[in-house]
Regions:
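Alpha-helical elements of Rossmann-like donor-binding domains used by nucleotide-donor carbohydrate transfer enzymes
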Residues: 20, 43-47, 113, 117, ...
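Conserved acetyl-CoA-binding loop-helix of GNAT-fold acetyltransferases
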Residues: 107-121, 144-148
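Hydrophobic pocket-lining residues that define ligand/cofactor binding sites across diverse proteins
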Residues: 122-126
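C-terminal "cap" of GNAT-fold acetyltransferases
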Residues: 90-94, 129-132, 136-140, 156-176
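Conserved acetyl-CoA-binding loop of GNAT-fold acetyltransferases
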Residues: 147-157
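Active-site acidic-Proline motif in GNAT/NAT acetyltransferases
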Residues: 102-104, 108, 137-138
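A short, well-structured alpha-helix characteristic of acyl/acetyltransferase catalytic modules
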Residues: 1-6, 11-46
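Acetyl-CoA-dependent GNAT
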Residues: 45-105, 121
Length: 176
């Protein structure tokens, strides 16, 4: 997927991509919104290796800006448990996650353009009815970005984060 100087390419099972992810997961501004802690190289490889496979249920794309990796974006079909958690009844619903790992490139539209590229793909090629993004409630820049992409706040919910702490999330949806 491509839009001018933004390219979304599949994450590769190689040292270069894993090392880039490790670099980004060392940034507090990144890991505090996703894993709640720094990840080691092996943890990153164990998490992302299955997502590099063609039949992955959670395809991950490296976001490249001017041919340089700057973040990742991924999607997955929402399962029944999460539909209940999010209070969504539609059948073909996908959840999107994104982060721009290069902090100097925050707030310049790359995230918005990347989300719009993936959204178009999911609506056009996967026949998505609804797209969902669920940022932490305190991640105001992400919420603003998603609103600029046409996502609207549906509700708030509490659930455990990746290390078991209860967190407040915002469920945002974009309909086709």
């Amino acid at each position: 997927m491509k839009d001018k100087n933004i390219t979304l390419r599949r994450l590769l099972d190689n040292d270069a991509d894993y090392k880039m992810l490790k670099k980004w997961y060392q940034e507090k501004e990144i890991y505090s919104h996703f894993e709640q802690r720094k990840l080691t190289y092996n943890e990153i490889k164990n998490k992302y290796l299955p997502r590099t496979l063609d039949n992955s249920l959670i395809p991950v794309f490296m976001i490249e800006h001017n041919n340089q990796p700057i973040g990742i974006i991924q999607y997955q079909l929402i399962n029944e448990d999460n539909k209940k958690l999010y209070n969504i009844n539609n059948d073909n619903c996908y959840e999107i996650d994104i982060f721009i790992g290069e902090l100097k490139l925050h707030n310049n539209g790359i995230g918005r353009r990347s989300i719009n590229l993936l959204s178009k793909y999911l609506f056009d090629k996967k026949n998505a009815d609804i797209l969902v993004m669920c940022p932490l409630k305190n991640n105001i820049p992400a919420i603003r970005c998603y609103e600029h992409c046409g996502f609207k706040i549906l509700n708030e919910f509490k659930t455990k984060d990746t290390i078991g702490n209860m967190q407040d999330f915002i469920c945002m949806i974009r309909e086709n």
